Structures are given as structure tokens and as C-alpha cells.
Amino acid sequence: MKEIRSEIELHSSVSTAWKILTDFSTFHVWNPVITQIIGEACLGERLKISVRTKKGKTRIYRPTITKLEENHELRWKGKSFIPGFLNGERIFIFQQTSRDYVRLLHSELFSGFGTIIAGHRLIEDVESSLQQMNNAFKKRVEHET
């Protein structure tokens, strides 16, 4: 299993950050990586997610929301067409660090033998996309505050 982690401090309340993260209909406005999410922020919901790759191509994923704790944690998990090849779980956790600041812990967990094949390239691409998304999210959240 491989875990790729990132975090960012936001000058915002948890409720504002949560509202923006779970408003999937506006991802296309602010998110350079996840350009569309079709579905609702509900436990068990199967989403259709469009992701722009580093090379500018669009990939479609269909993960399911596996955890939803309001103002705290959102997770979705997807599987490849080939069982056991590559599974990914996107994790967003908010921590209130002070009255005016919140930390977003943003990570991706990968499992399956595809992680061996993709290896270093997978890690670099995902690290880059997490950072791009974090920076865009910070800009959006702090603009709303």
C-alpha cells in the first residue's frame, strides 16, 4: 500500500471549507485537477469524477463515498476494472487549528499490484495534483471568508 499525503493551512472556518469541498457542482469553477463531480455528498453515493491529468487528458473515475462526517472527513474509494490491480482512496480531513484557521489533510491511498508497476511516476503525479488542488482550494476558501 502506498500513501501520498499533503496538507495546507486555510484562513477559514471548518464549516466554510466543508461547504465548498462538498459542493461538487462548483468543482469546475475552482479545481484544476478534479474538473467535474457528478453525484451528491452522501454516504454510499457512487460518483462520476473527471480528472485532468498532468498531460491535459481527462480520465473518468467512479468511486463510492465510504466516509462522510460533516465538517470533519470525506473519503471516496475507487477500484480498477481488473480486480486487485489498482485501488485508490481519496481522503480529506479537516482540523480546526485555531478560531480562524483550519488544516486540510489531503491524501490518497493506493493498493494493488498496479502500485508496483506505476511506482515513482504515480507518486510524482499524485503529489503534484494534490498540491495543485490544495492551492486552488485555499484560494477559493479564503475568497469566501
Features from the language model and the residues they span:
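Short aromatic-glycine motifs in intrinsically disordered, low-complexity regions
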Residues: 50-54
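A conserved amphipathic terminal alpha-helix motif
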Residues: 103, 109-145
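Juxtamembrane/interface motifs at transmembrane-helix termini
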Residues: 36-40, 49, 95-96, 123-126
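Hydrophobic pocket/interface hotspot
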Residues: 16-21, 27, 47-49, 65, ...
